[in-house]
From Swiss-Prot:
<dbReference type="InterPro" id="IPR019927">
    <property type="entry name" value="Ribosomal_uL3_bac/org-type"/>
</dbReference>
<feature type="modified residue" description="N5-methylglutamine">
    <location>
        <position position="150"/>
    </location>
</feature>
<dbReference type="GO" id="GO:0006412">
    <property type="term" value="P:translation"/>
</dbReference>
<dbReference type="GO" id="GO:0003735">
    <property type="term" value="F:structural constituent of ribosome"/>
</dbReference>
<keyword id="KW-0694">RNA-binding</keyword>
<comment type="similarity">
    <text>Belongs to the universal ribosomal protein uL3 family.</text>
</comment>
<dbReference type="GO" id="GO:0022625">
    <property type="term" value="C:cytosolic large ribosomal subunit"/>
</dbReference>
<dbReference type="InterPro" id="IPR009000">
    <property type="entry name" value="Transl_B-barrel_sf"/>
</dbReference>
<keyword id="KW-0488">Methylation</keyword>
<dbReference type="InterPro" id="IPR019926">
    <property type="entry name" value="Ribosomal_uL3_CS"/>
</dbReference>
<comment type="subunit">
    <text>Part of the 50S ribosomal subunit. Forms a cluster with proteins L14 and L19.</text>
</comment>
<keyword id="KW-0687">Ribonucleoprotein</keyword>
<dbReference type="Pfam" id="PF00297">
    <property type="entry name" value="Ribosomal_L3"/>
</dbReference>
<dbReference type="InterPro" id="IPR000597">
    <property type="entry name" value="Ribosomal_uL3"/>
</dbReference>
<keyword id="KW-0689">Ribosomal protein</keyword>
<protein>
    <recommendedName>
        <fullName>Large ribosomal subunit protein uL3</fullName>
    </recommendedName>
</protein>
<keyword id="KW-0699">rRNA-binding</keyword>
C-alpha cells in the first residue's frame, strides 16, 4: 500500500470514553495528486509520483512547470514517490485522500528533525561528563580520546564527535492511528513525530504492524 504526503499541524490531546488522555499529533493530509505513474516496462519498477498543496506560479521553475502541465495537475509544494504493490493501480491526475488510512491501525511517519546547530558530544551523543573536580580543571565536557595508536593511525569513520545536531531525515515507526477526519483532511496519530509545525511528513502504513 502507498503512503501520502502531509503537513505537521501540531500536538494536542483527546480523551477516550473512559476519560483517558491520549497525546496526539495532528497531520493535515490534503488530497495527493498523481503527477506520474512509473511502469515496469519503461522504468524497471512500479511507482507513483504525487504532489500536494499549492505553490506560487513565480516559485515554479520551468522543468517543474512542464512536468505538472504534462500531467494536467496543479503545481504542489513537494514531489514524492511511492512504490506500488501488486494489484495497485492509479492514473495520472487522480486524487488520493486521507481516507486510504481508514482501515490502517499503525503508521510510520518520516520527517526532517528540528535543527539544533553545532552541539558537543554530551548533548549530541549522550556522552557522560568527566569529573567536576579531583584534579580535572579543564576537561569536564570534552570527548576524550578519539583513537588508538600508530596502528591504526587514523580516526575511524562514523566516530561519535561534536557536530551538527538535528536537521536530518528521521522515521518514527508504528504510531497508533487514533482518528481519521476525512472532512477536514486530518490524521491523528498517538505520540510525537519529527520536525517543526508546518514541516512536510511522509505517512505510510507501518512496516512492522
Amino acid at each position: 500500500m502507498i503512503g501520502l504526503v502531509g503537513k505537521k499541524v501540531g500536538m494536542t490531546r483527546i480523551f477516550t470514553e473512559d476519560g483517558v488522555s491520549i497525546p496526539v499529533t495532528v497531520i493535515e493530509i490534503e488530497d495527493n495528486r498523481v503527477t506520474q505513474v512509473k511502469e515496469l516496462d519503461n522504468d524497471g519498477y512500479r511507482a507513483i509520483q504525487v504532489t500536494t498543496g499549492s505553490k506560487k506560479a513565480s516559485r515554479v521553475n520551468k522543468p517543474e512547470a512542464g512536468h505538472f502541465a504534462k500531467a494536467g495537475v496543479e503545481a504542489g509544494r513537494i514531489l514524492r514517490e511511492f512504490r506500488l504493490s501488486e494489484g495497485e493501480e492509479y492514473a495520472v491526475g487522480q486524487s488520493i485522500s486521507v481516507e486510504i488510512f481508514a482501515d490502517v491501525k499503525k503508521v510510520d511517519v518520516t520527517g526532517t528533525s528540528k535543527g539544533k546547530g553545532f552541539a558537543g558530544t554530551v548533548k549530541r551523543w549522550n556522552f557522560r561528563t568527566q569529573d567536576a573536580s579531583h584534579g580535572n580543571s579543564l576537561s569536564h565536557r570534552v570527548p576524550g580520546s578519539i583513537g588508538q595508536n600508530q596502528t591504526p593511525g587514523k580516526v575511524f569513520k562514523g566516530k561519535k564527535m561534536a557536530g551538527q545536531l538535528g536537521n536530518e531525515r528521521v522515521t518514527v515507526q508504528s504510531l497508533d492511528v487514533v482518528r481519521v477526519d476525512a472532512e477536514r483532511n486530518l490524521l491523528l496519530v498517538k505520540g510525537a513525530v519529527p520536525g517543526s509545525t508546518g514541516g512536510n511528513l511522509i505517512v505510510k502504513p507501518a512496516v512492522k504492524a
